[in-house]
């Protein structure tokens, strides 16, 4: 185990080097991610219409006025600072004072979660998304210090920045419950119930305050917020099932199947660990804890009629995997089992790390390809007569073969690098006037619109990568790639 000895000896140097490479991979594509293009080309913020008014205020402050400003890479760097602050808070509060290699690695999934890449690639949104996560984590520790008003204020502000981030509050509460299980064997049920009740009460008060003081009176409803604000209890089970389906993409592919086996092994070890610690009451804790993580996966989509399951809303995932690894590290923290522990830690963290590097390369390849195709598309659109007031509809997506190969290996990459729903924003950069586009509740509605009308439209332009249809009122740009609808 000479190699392991060297890793332990130089663990801090390795930690810094590997994380710097991960950060470089994240920042190096230098892309306009999703609706970054919309904000950059349109010159306005408009997060308030998505129930995030504090985000507008933040950019009015750092941008020194209402006019749009692009401070990249500063927002992403600050977002990374917030993210690593969460990591070190977890190290401080949930490990022993002695810093071991295991402790350093256990909480890495909080940073390297593949789903979190969808938050970090935003050159504008990332700063307040991760700030909201940090505030949600800090709120829990304020509750522990019995500073309830401060905790409510932190959650209130987090909600004003990015509502899905508050699942970090729930996840951190579950870690503290885990700590209680370790340190208290007497009256554990009473203590566990009391803590849970306090955490929930603070959480509920913050949400109610935000709803009645901000959402109900100050939100300027737009198409997105109006569409994604209708709720019903009947949506609970279907939305939970849909969230699990979306997250299960992480287990697809050849490497993903190995990760799936390890994941179930971690869940089993977590159950064994809890039963060892608190007898059969551990089974109840196991069920409640994992159900809580599942509900955190659904997050703000829990009761929505039209949920929006974007990867950026799955903030819980890194916390959940770290929770499983923490219990496993306690159970296998013996000389006879440590080699198995190191194997598990290495595979899980390298799997996440590899996805991040592959996403970075996919983003670069896709950006180069889309830039060249977009120039041709813009030229074709300028040649179309009498369509200054047309509405645009983009359908499908074309991925270069390099990106296809990476997606075959790691299917989770596909939705991270997908940009089909945001081509209209990329297009705006080439037109001096605001383009109009058809709005749809979801992709199914868009595809139905296409199927219903395509035979009534004239083919205006044909290209290897796309077809342009038109009828004088609408322009449909259909991309022909394997990622497309047809």
Descriptions of predicted regions:
Residues 2-59, 63-83, 92-107, 253, ...:
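Intrinsically disordered, polar/acidic, low-complexity terminal segments
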Residues 22-85, 105, 123, 156, ...:
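Transmembrane catalytic cores of multi-pass membrane glycosyltransferases
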Residues 68-73, 97-103, 145-150, 188, ...:
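Membrane-helix interface segments
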Residues 75-88, 110-111, 133-136, 322:
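Transmembrane alpha-helical segments of multi-pass membrane glycosylation machinery
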Residues 101-135, 160:
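Aromatic- and kink-enriched transmembrane "portal" helix at the membrane-lumen/periplasm boundary
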Residues 116-126, 304-309, 359-362:
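Membrane-interface helix caps and helix-loop-helix hairpins in membrane proteins
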Residues 136-150, 183:
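Membrane-interface transmembrane helices that cradle and orient dolichyl/undecaprenyl
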Residues 331-355:
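Signature aromatic-anchored transmembrane alpha helix within multi-pass, membrane-resident enzymes
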């Amino acid at each position: 185990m000479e190699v392991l000895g060297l890793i332990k000896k130089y663990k801090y140097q390795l930690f810094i080097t590997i994380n710097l490479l991960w950060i470089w991979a994240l920042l190096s594509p230098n892309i306009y991610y999703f609706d970054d293009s919309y904000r950059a080309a349109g010159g306005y913020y408009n997060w308030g219409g998505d129930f995030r008014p504090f985000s507008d205020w933040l950019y009015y402050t750092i941008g020194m006025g209402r006019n749009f400003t692009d401070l990249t890479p500063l927002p992403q760097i600050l977002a990374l600072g917030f993210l690593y602050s969460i990591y070190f808070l977890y190290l401080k509060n949930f490990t022993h004072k002695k810093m071991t290699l295991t402790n350093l690695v256990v909480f890495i999934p909080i940073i390297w979660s593949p789903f979190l890449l969808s938050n970090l690639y935003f050159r504008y949104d990332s700063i307040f998304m991760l700030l909201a996560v940090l505030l949600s984590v800090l709120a829990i520790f304020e509750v522990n210090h019995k500073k309830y008003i401060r905790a409510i204020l932190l959650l209130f502000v987090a909600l004003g920045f990015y509502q899905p981030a508050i699942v970090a509050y729930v996840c951190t509460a579950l870690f503290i419950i885990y700590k209680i299980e370790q340190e208290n064997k007497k009256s554990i049920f009473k203590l566990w119930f009391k803590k849970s009740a306090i955490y929930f009460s603070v959480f509920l008060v913050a949400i109610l305050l935000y709803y009645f003081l901000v959402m109900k009176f100050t939100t300027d409803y737009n198409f997105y917020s109006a569409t994604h604000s209708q709720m019903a209890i009947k949506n609970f089970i279907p939305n939970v099932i849909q969230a699990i389906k979306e997250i299960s993409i992480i287990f697809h592919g050849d490497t993903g199947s190995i990760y799936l086996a390890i994941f179930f092994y971690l869940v089993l070890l977590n159950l064994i660990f809890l039963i060892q610690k608190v007898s059969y009451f551990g089974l109840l804790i196991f069920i409640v804890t994992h159900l809580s993580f599942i509900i955190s996966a659904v997050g703000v989509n829990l009761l929505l009629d039209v949920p929006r399951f974007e990867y950026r809303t799955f903030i819980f995932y890194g916390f959940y995997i770290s929770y499983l690894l923490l219990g496993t590290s306690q159970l296998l923290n013996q000389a006879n089992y440590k080699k198995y522990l190191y194997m598990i830690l290495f595979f899980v963290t390298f799997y996440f790390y590899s996805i991040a590097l592959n996403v970075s390369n996919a983003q670069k390849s896709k950006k180069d390809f889309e830039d060249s195709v977009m120039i041709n598309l813009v030229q074709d659109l300028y040649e179309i007569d009498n369509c200054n007031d047309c509405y645009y509809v983009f359908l499908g997506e074309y991925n270069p073969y390099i990106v296809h190969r990476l997606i075959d290996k790691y299917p989770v990459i596909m939705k991270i690098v997908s940009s089909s729903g945001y081509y209209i924003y990329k297009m705006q950069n080439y037109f001096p006037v605001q383009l109009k586009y058809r709005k749809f509740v979801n992709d199914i509605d868009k595809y139905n619109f296409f199927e219903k009308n395509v035979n009534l439209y004239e083919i205006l332009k044909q290209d290897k990568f796309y077809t342009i249809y038109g009828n004088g009122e609408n322009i449909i740009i259909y991309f022909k790639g394997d990622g497309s609808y047809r």
